[in-house]
């Protein structure tokens, strides 16, 4: 009897070896950018077998500053690989031809004239008077390097074809979907941000998927640039709830009884002027009636005096005596029941701190960092950080009252190089390089917790070090706002780990930099301290810039993207048979 079947002739297929050749895909990119936005500075198609080595040199300058502002500005570059199958569910059938070899799916696209008209609508604004303004070419379409409609402010027409350009060339939707998927998986704060729709099942012409109106275009797949969130600190890492899940109840069970009353029912009345309370005599005294009024709530009248109206918000009915229980019983929980409740509470707390993404859940509970490819998400490849330094520009021309000699303005400048990343693609997809510029946060409107301790248990005690999450008061971030709430003290902002205030020091500003010299810092003023997307989103911090318009780009950056590629294709495309 044969020991094993060794004939592999019919169990394997010989595949041809594809030679690899080196190519230099390096290119420069020069553009203008905003603070806090996510820009795709690299978007390169990758093939199975490709080996890319990528890094980016950069030189960044700020637009003119009204002062040599203090604060840390940093430019971040992150590299990702996004497989096509994650952004188009029919990709595998399309690229293989399906089981029949005749699959008819068409890759998702938008005709260029529709895409450009949409970009025009996104960057347009009607102030209600019929006067339209048009933002610069800084949307997502332009950020990908695609051309947009040339436009002159004097001849705006809503959804019109401008300057006779009306090409219907199909523009692939896959890079746009990949950009949104990266934001969903890496930049979105799942505690406050909803996941953006990718609609990976849609293919072919997507024109009918989007209504031709500015708001719908802006919210759609091809809309505006997405925003970065502030780096995590005591406030920006706060949780909206102390745990991710329902409250865990102590496992104490029993049969419910009844409460019996055998005593006079009395009325507790509060005086609005003095704040004092008075308990009436028995409500059921002779000649005393209790009734409900249409507007005043509870009313009391007697044969002695007129009706006495009592506001509902300032009264309580109470029994003076005679309250007893009957028929009830309570059964104590077992030690195992208590253990289960404590373990479940701990489970919910870890889930809240770790995050709701699958990769975060595995890391939080099992301390295992799964690879991005295994979890079907964009793969993070690496990146780098560049500091942007701000220096002074001295006024050395003639002296006048508005700009005396020696007056200081500012200029920002930075040079950097990202870390080098190497990646071998095993399937079709896109290499992304995502750039963002964000300042380090500074705070000056709140009162730290150590200034408001009122009892000894407000201080640190080792016995309490492992209790659950503790509250962050709104007054720690903003003590009050004339626009929203004049007194934020005692109002919940979010939750942080126990005694986190002892382990963190926030950046602060003082003196005139809080007011008249506010243009000397990149600090932002917070008027509505609620834990939501608006608070965590990096805004356009315009304080130090000479031009305060939020629609004006504040940075000019030169990128030298160095990409060395080893690709499965001939170096020369010489015709042959």
Predicted regions and their residues:
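Intrinsically disordered, low-complexity segments
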Residues: 1-577
């Amino acid at each position: 009897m044969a020991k094993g079947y060794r004939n592999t002739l019919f169990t394997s297929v010989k595949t041809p070896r594809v030679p690899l050749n080196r190519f230099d895909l390096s290119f420069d990119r020069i553009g203008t950018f905003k603070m806090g936005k996510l820009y795709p500075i690299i978007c390169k198609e990758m093939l199975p077998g490709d080996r890319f080595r990528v890094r980016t040199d950069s030189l960044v300058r700020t637009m003119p500053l009204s002062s040599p502002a203090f604060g840390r500005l940093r430019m971040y570059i992150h590299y990702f690989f996004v497989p096509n199958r994650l952004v188009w569910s029919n990709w595998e059938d399309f690229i293989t031809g399906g089981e029949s070899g005749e699959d008819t799916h068409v890759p998702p696209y938008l005709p260029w004239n529709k895409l450009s008209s949409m970009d025009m609508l996104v960057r347009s604004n009607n102030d209600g008077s019929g006067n339209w303004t048009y933002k610069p070419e800084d949307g997502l379409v332009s950020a990908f390097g695609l051309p947009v409609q040339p436009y002159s402010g004097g001849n705006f027409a809503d959804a019109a074809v401008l300057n006779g350009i009306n090409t219907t060339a199909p523009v692939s939707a896959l890079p746009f979907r990949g950009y949104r998927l990266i934001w969903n998986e890496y930049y979105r704060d799942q505690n406050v941000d909803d996941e953006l729709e990718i609609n990976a099942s849609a293919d072919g012409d997507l024109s009918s998927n989007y209504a031709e109106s500015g708001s719908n275009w802006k919210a759609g797949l091809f809309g505006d640039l997405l925003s970065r969130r502030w780096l995590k600190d005591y406030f920006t890492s706060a949780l909206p709830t102390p745990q991710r899940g329902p409250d865990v109840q102590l496992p104490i069970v029993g049969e419910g009884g009844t409460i019996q009353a055998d005593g006079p029912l009395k009325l507790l009345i509060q005086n609005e002027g003095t704040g004092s309370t008075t308990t009436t005599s028995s409500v059921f005294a002779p000649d005393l009636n209790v009734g409900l009024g249409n507007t005043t709530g509870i009313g009391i009248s007697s044969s002695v005096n007129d009706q006495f109206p009592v506001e509902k918000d300032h009264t309580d009915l109470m029994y003076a005596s005679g309250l007893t229980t009957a028929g009830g019983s309570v059964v104590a929980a077992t030690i195992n029941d208590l253990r289960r409740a404590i373990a479940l509470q701990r489970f919910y707390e870890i889930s809240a701190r770790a995050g709701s993404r699958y990769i975060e859940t595995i890391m939080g509970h099992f301390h295992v960092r799964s690879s991005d490819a295994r979890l079907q998400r964009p793969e993070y490849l690496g990146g780098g950080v560049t500091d942007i330094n701000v220096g002074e520009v001295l006024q050395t021309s003639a002296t006048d009252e508005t700009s005396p000699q020696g007056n200081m303005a500012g200029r920002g400048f930075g040079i950097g190089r990202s870390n080098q990343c190497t990646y071998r693609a095993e399937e079709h997809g896109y290499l992304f390089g995502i750039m963002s510029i964000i300042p380090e946060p500074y705070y000056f409107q709140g009162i730290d917790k150590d200034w408001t301790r009122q009892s000894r248990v407000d201080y640190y005690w080792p016995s309490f070090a492992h209790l659950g999450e503790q509250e962050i008061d709104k007054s720690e971030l903003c003590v009050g706002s004339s626009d929203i709430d004049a007194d934020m003290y005692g109002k919940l902002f979010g939750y942080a780990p126990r005694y986190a205030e002892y382990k963190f020091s926030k950046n602060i500003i003082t003196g005139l930099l809080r007011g008249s010299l506010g243009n000397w810092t990149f600090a932002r003023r917070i008027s509505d301290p609620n834990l939501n997307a608006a608070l965590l989103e990096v805004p356009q911090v315009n304080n130090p810039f000479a031009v305060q318009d939020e629609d004006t780009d504040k940075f000019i950056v030169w990128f030298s993207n160095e990409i060395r590629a080893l690709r499965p294709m001939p170096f020369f495309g010489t015709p042959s048979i």
